[in-house]
Amino acid sequence: MANDPRKLLVTCALPYANGSIHLGHMLEHIQADIWVRYQRLRGNTVNFICADDAHGTPIMLKAQQMGMTPEAMIEMVSEEHQRDFAGFDISFDNYHSTHSDENRELASHIYLQLKKNGFISSRTISQLFDPEKEMFLPDRFVKGTCPKCKSEDQYGDNCDACGETYSPTELINPKSAVSGATPVMKDSEHFFFDLPQFESMLKEWTRSGSLQSETANKMQEWFEGGLQQWDISRDAPYFGFEIPGEKDKFFYVWLDAPIGYMGSFKNLCDKRGDLNFNEYWNKDSKTELYHFIGKDIVYFHSLFWPAMLDGSGFRKPTNVFVHGYVTVNGAKMSKSKGTFVKASTYLNHLDPECLRYYYAAKLNNRIDDLDLNLEDFTQRVNADVVNKIVNLASRNAGFITKRFDGKLSAHFAEPELYAEFAGAADRIAELFEAREFGRAIREITALADKANQYVDEKAPWVVAKQEGQDQALQDICTVGINLFRILMTYLKPVMPALAERTEAFLNQELTWEGVATPLTDHAVTPFKALFNRIDPKQVEAMIEASKAEAAAEKAAADAAKPKSAETELSKDPLAAEIEFDDFAKVDLRIAKILSCEAVEKSDKLLKFELDIGGETRQVFSGIKSAYQPEDLIGKYTVVVANLKPRKMKFGMSEGMILAAGPGGSDLWLLEPHQGAQAGMRVM
């Protein structure tokens, strides 16, 4: 490590302020926190920041549904988010909001600099517009029938059923997801960031060698496909920042969201006197800037964000660390199965250190998805943390307390063994630095196996019963406790709460430098249980609680959904398509009603005598509940004239009168416009 401590600014992607934190979010925040804690443990200066992403149409609409202002809702959600992160020991130096004065000033400044430097243009575009709510509709707020597979109730940008992507204007029977109204096309002036001007800079940044290979390869695909101008504006009504100098135009949420990193850091600088904002963000900054993000937002962080920074005179990120998604038991997180687990639900049932350890044990520096297998989760935490590591302390601490008043030996009996454990520090440090946490955990647990093997071979419980072996017993237990001390130092970034309890037991802080020298002639405190094993029933209870929460939320959401206006077509869908030749076989004619009478002993039928143009027909029709017979005499209607005569109980019916409606009293006879004559063909 260099003599001068590094200065690092580290961020996590900003959680959206319209919902709860779940175990998918926690992967990123735990990954970043482990890396940050490792850097601090090595003496580096780290500013670890985050904020809520608090703007956009979804937040505006959800606040309306909840009957509160967007400001009140995002404040409530922020409190929940911060409570969850604190519960998992995520050690942010500052947690802020994109809806802040700092962010407004920085977003406006960056936009105006980009505009001044010729990177902003405007043009008129056509978008779907909700005529009832009087608002333009984002793609995800339009629903309809997929133009490819014809699946109904699909979003305006892609079909969940067949995976097809499309424009919302291609949907069949599109409806606003906000009001249920049929959207119309409307023109509006929008503002665009000229991303193609930054292609050469972005290619050079990609070739720097610091980006993950998967990210660099993906960027190359985007370059080959051609970079496009980026729409950075949205029309009122919209919850966000107004664009300087424009009326009813707002910054798109993805413009001011990453600027939220800067806004949160600026807020931290204003709180403290020892931080200089410009030192970290100026174009020639010597500090390091790292973003931890999920693979779903690589596009914004690897293209738009560095280009915006470069075009407005700020530094670019040192690196962007991308991770995959979380699956549970090999499948996508599911609310119905209870595997879509909120952070708060987890905290109600299980120790956060368990998840921190399990995620660390499976994380690497690639963009791989991570599977939270709940059975493996239980077994691994119990086997590694309880049986191998914590048990190492409990096997030795009792003897030290009872037989030696808590005092460790004045000399260390196994210097070579200690040197082997301490010598692993550089190797484990390299793995932590490279975010190869899974490999680091494997190194640590391999050392734990050796430590337990040493204790098994020395068998202090046997030595304790032997006369005159007190010094040997104290030496063995001193070695065991020191090996435990090294292991817990290596695990300190992963399990900070367990490390803190270990420090209380050892009566000494765990430091990376301290690993070099064993702890001797030192008093430890009486041993208390440091960690509890996972009971599978706790996991089951968490899953059941998640199911119940999801069901309650779905019921509430369904009740709050705008009811789409029911149409006649939705109540009675179209029949299967027929060929034109089939339709051409039907002979529809205008008929004049010469007489009409009720059929005795029938609740539904009227008997008609019809003139179809020089020929008289007898027809029975089931519209008795809708009309009085005398009211129909002399009217014109439409009849199927070539329908094969049908013998009925009350006589022969020689055609079919056409009427519309669901039935009963809700039936309406089809009548032609004035001028139509009996016998005319209906074309």
Swiss-Prot record:
An example molecular function term from Gene Ontology annotations: methionine-tRNA ligase activity
What cofactor does this chain's UniProt record say it requires? Answer: Zn(2+)
One GO-annotated biological process of the protein: methionyl-tRNA aminoacylation
The record's catalysed reaction(s) read: tRNA(Met) + L-methionine + ATP = L-methionyl-tRNA(Met) + AMP + diphosphate
Transmembrane feature ranges: none
Q: How is the cofactor bound?
A: Binds 1 zinc ion per subunit.
Q: How does it assemble?
A: Homodimer.
By its UniProt entry, which PANTHER family does this protein fall under? METHIONINE--TRNA LIGASE (PTHR45765), METHIONINE--TRNA LIGASE, CYTOPLASMIC (PTHR45765:SF1)
Q: Any idea what this protein is called? A: Methionine--tRNA ligase
